[in-house]
């Protein structure tokens, strides 16, 4: 093994957390060999973990999914029943393509172009490879003034760059016919940047890898990872298109070259334009996101066009539960969304009794918000949610409707307590808009953990109306308690109140009146009698 060339199959570069909570750096081969001993990937960013997970999945697809499966769930179940991954088959594949996994190579460097050169002969600092956006929940930018990074770090950020790189003008590459004036003009962000990425997570990394390995799909022999393709050049590949998830997992949106210094670290880089992707037509290929019907794109192409569904970082994941777990497409009342295939696959496994029907599916989502023209980083965020596996099934329409209604009632209750906060501020002579926003945020915060717990406990096989009624009562009590706190803190000015004239109409705002409005709205939004809990079939 030539360590100076750094083969990612056998050299450690992937950050993981073991079952005891310790972080380790492992090679690709060791990860597959010991996946059952690792809890999860533990890279610098959730988006980095997502990008690396997809590379690992590309390997597994090529090992186990070389042709259509006659009995997809049964064949998958045979692998699931093992305590570890079938390492012999995996190693055989890795050894076959070993020469394509050298990070530094004169002819075929991993995910790079060996002779990539800028038209001006210059290179860029290596920190261009690393996002300069705030980490969710953190105070500092990811990017620092790196003079160099280790090959292991470079390998991680190389995978991230292909998946998520920002758009904007790139360095013009010699041999790229699209270059004008030494510049590569924008061709869009990396493919994963379009996605509200979804990962089904297991109790360890072995389970996570398998749960995201969808055997029930049409196999296309052209669907191969980039390391099985001819070595990349600086030029755009002619007529390049994805033929399945494997190609998308390793799509070369950029042409990249890492430059080593005398110590063997990476100190300079080139990032140039690669292959653009037809982002409007990937719903039959991409398996790790949900989909939304795009009216503008459908009008443009004269057919239904589904675009990757993205997540709103300002909202908790459960507030969009109707899009995350849509009802069947055959239901014309809700054909605006299509389910995420990896979530649906878990439901298929449960319906075929490969997984328990009581299994709680846990998902982790990853999203990126870009700046203007997608030419800068804004935010990278993630969220988690757990629910009964059967909620992803097309057969669970009635249960889904109950969950939708539960989320809607929670959201409306938060909005109602927000209006209470605004009305109390008006009564006290304060800023109603600011107070309303703060109270609404408090409402959502108060309901967040309880809703997640309720959803994890929700069972489609039990009485959904009883479960909805219990949740509605819980929301009522939590929001009523929050309202009591707001009223107690409103101050004497609010109790006295004031008259406010708007549009030639005068209304008296006071604590007492605000409470009356609040109570009326809350009772209307949260019906608690048994007759009003019923969900239509």
Task: Indicate residue ranges for each PLM-predicted region.
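Extended alpha-helical scaffolding segments
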Residues: 1-136, 160, 165-537
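Short functional micro-motifs and their immediate structural scaffolds
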Residues: 155-158
């Amino acid at each position: 093994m030539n360590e100076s060339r750094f083969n990612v199959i056998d050299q450690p570069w992937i950050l993981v957390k073991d079952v005891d909570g310790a972080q380790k750096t492992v090679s690709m081969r060791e990860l597959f060999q010991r996946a059952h001993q690792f809890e999860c990937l533990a890279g610098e960013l959730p988006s980095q973990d997502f990008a690396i997970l997809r590379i690992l999945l590309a390997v597994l697809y090529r090992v186990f999914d070389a042709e259509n499966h006659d009995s997809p769930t049964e064949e998958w179940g045979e692998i699931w029943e093992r305590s570890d991954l079938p390492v012999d088959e995996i190693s055989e594949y890795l050894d076959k393509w070993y020469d394509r996994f050298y990070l530094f190579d004169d002819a075929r460097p991993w995910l790079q172009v060996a002779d990539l050169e800028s038209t001006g002969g210059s290179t860029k600092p290596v920190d261009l490879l690393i996002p300069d956006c705030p980490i969710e929940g953190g105070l500092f930018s990811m990017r620092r003034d790196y003079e160099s990074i280790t090959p292991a770090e470079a390998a991680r950020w190389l995978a991230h760059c292909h998946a998520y790189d920002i758009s904007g003008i790139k360095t013009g590459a010699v041999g790229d016919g699209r270059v004008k004036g030494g510049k590569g003009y924008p061709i869009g962000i990396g493919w994963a940047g379009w996605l509200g990425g979804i990962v089904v997570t297991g109790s360890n990394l072995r389970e996570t890898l398998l749960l995201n390995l969808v055997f029930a799909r049409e196999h296309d022999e052209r669907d191969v990872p980039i390391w099985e393709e001819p070595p990349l050049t600086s030029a755009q590949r002619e007529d390049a298109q994805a033929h399945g998830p494997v190609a998308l997992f390793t799509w070369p949106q950029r042409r990249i070259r890492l430059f080593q210094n005398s110590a063997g670290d990476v100190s300079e880089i080139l990032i140039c334009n690669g292959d653009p992707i037809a982002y409007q037509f990937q719903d039959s290929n991409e398996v790790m996101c949900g989909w939304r019907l795009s009216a503008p794109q459908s009008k443009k192409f004269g057919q239904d066009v589904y675009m990757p569904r993205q997540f709103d970082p300002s909202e908790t994941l459960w507030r969009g539960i109707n899009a995350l777990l849509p009802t069947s497409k055959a239901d014309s009342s809700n054909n605006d969304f299509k389910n995420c295939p990896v979530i649906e696959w878990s439901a298929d496994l449960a319906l075929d009794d490969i997984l328990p029907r009581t299994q709680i599916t846990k998902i982790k989502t990853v999203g990126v918000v870009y700046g203007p023209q997608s030419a800068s980083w804004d935010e990278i965020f993630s969220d988690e949610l757990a629910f009964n596996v059967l909620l992803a099934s097309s057969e669970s329409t009635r249960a889904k409707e109950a969950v939708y209604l539960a989320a809607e009632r929670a959201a409306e209750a938060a909005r109602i307590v927000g209006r209470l906060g605004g009305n109390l501020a008006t009564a006290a002579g304060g800023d109603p808009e600011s107070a309303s926003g703060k109270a609404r945020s408090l409402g959502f915060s108060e309901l967040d953990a309880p809703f997640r717990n309720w959803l994890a406990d929700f069972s489609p096989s039990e009485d959904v109306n009883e479960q909805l009624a219990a949740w509605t009562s819980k929301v009522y009590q939590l929001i009523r308690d929050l309202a009591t706190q707001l009223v107690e803190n409103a101050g004497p000015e609010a109790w006295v109140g004031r008259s406010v004239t708007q549009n030639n109409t005068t209304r008296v705002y006071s604590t007492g009146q605000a409470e009356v409005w609040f109570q009326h709205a809350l009772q209307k939004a949260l019906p608690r009698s048994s007759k009003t809990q019923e969900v239509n079939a």
